[in-house]
Amino acid sequence: MSRNKINIKRKYGLTVKDILDFRDRARAELDTLVNSEELLIELAKKKEKAYDTALVLAERLHEKRTAAAAELERRVKETLEFLDMPKVVFYASINERTEDGKKKLNPIGIDEIEFFISANRGAEPQSIAKIASGGELARIMLALKSVIADKDGIMTVIFDEIDAGVSGKTARKIGIKMRSLSNTSQLLCVTHSAQIASLAHTHYLIKKSDVEGKTESSLTPLDREGRICELSRILGGINVTESQRAAAIDMLSENE
C-alpha cells in the first residue's frame, strides 16, 4: 500500500494537496470533454454577440473617419503647399471591406484606408505607398504628422534626409514646420541641409572614421561654435570662407 502511495505522489504531486488539485483539474477537463458540444455552441453565441458589437462600433468609426477626411485633406494640402508643392492633389480613400457581400472586420475596423497624392499638375494620384522619392515621401509624412500631432500620441518621429532634392528655400520651410512640430513631439532628423540644421534646438555631428582598419561612427553634440563650424562646412564644402561663416552665424542668430 505504501508503495502505491509513493507511486501516486511521484506521478501526481509530492503532497496530498497537489494530488487533490490534480484530481480537480482532471475532473474539469473531463467535464469539458463530455460537454464539449454544448460548450462550443455557447462559445459560438458569445463570439457572434461580440462580433455584432464590434461591427456596430466599427460602423460608427467609419462614419467618423468619413466625416473627418475632408478636413484632413484640406489641412494636409495647405501644409504641402507651404512646403513648396503648389500643385499637389491629396485625398484619403476610405472603403468598407466586404466579403461575400457582408462587412468584414479587420484590426482597424471595417475600413481599408489609403492616401493618394499627386505632386505635379496632370499626374494621376498614386498611393503614398508607391511613391519612390524619399524626400517627397518625408515631406508628405511631415505634413500628415503636423496635422494630427495633437491626436496621434506618437512622441518621437525620425526623418531621414527629408531635404533630398529640395532647394534651400524649401529646406528652410521644412525646418520651420519641423521646429513648430517639435512643440508637441520629439523630432530626430538626419540632414545635409544647413537651413534645416540651423533650426534645430540641439545639433549632433555624425562622423565616420577609420579605427584600426574598421569603420566606426561617432555622435558628437555641438556647442554654438561647433554648430557654426559645421553649418559653415555644409554651406561651403572643403574651403570655408568668411562670408560662409558669417552666413552660418546669421542662420543661428535668427533662430535663437
Give residue spans per PLM region:
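Walker B catalytic acidic pair
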Residues: 160-161
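Loop/turn-to-beta-strand initiation segments
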Residues: 113, 153-155, 182-188
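GG-anchored amphipathic helix commonly corresponding to the ABC/SMC/Rad50 NBD signature/C-loop
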Residues: 114-115, 119-121, 135-157
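SMC-family hinge/dimerization module
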Residues: 67-137
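C-terminal lobe/lid and adjacent interdomain/linker elements of RecA-like ASCE P-loop ATPase modules
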Residues: 169-256
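Extended, charged alpha-helical coiled-coil/arm scaffolds that mediate oligomerization and mechanical coupling
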Residues: 1-83, 87
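Conserved D-loop-proximal element of ABC-family nucleotide-binding domains
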Residues: 152, 164-172
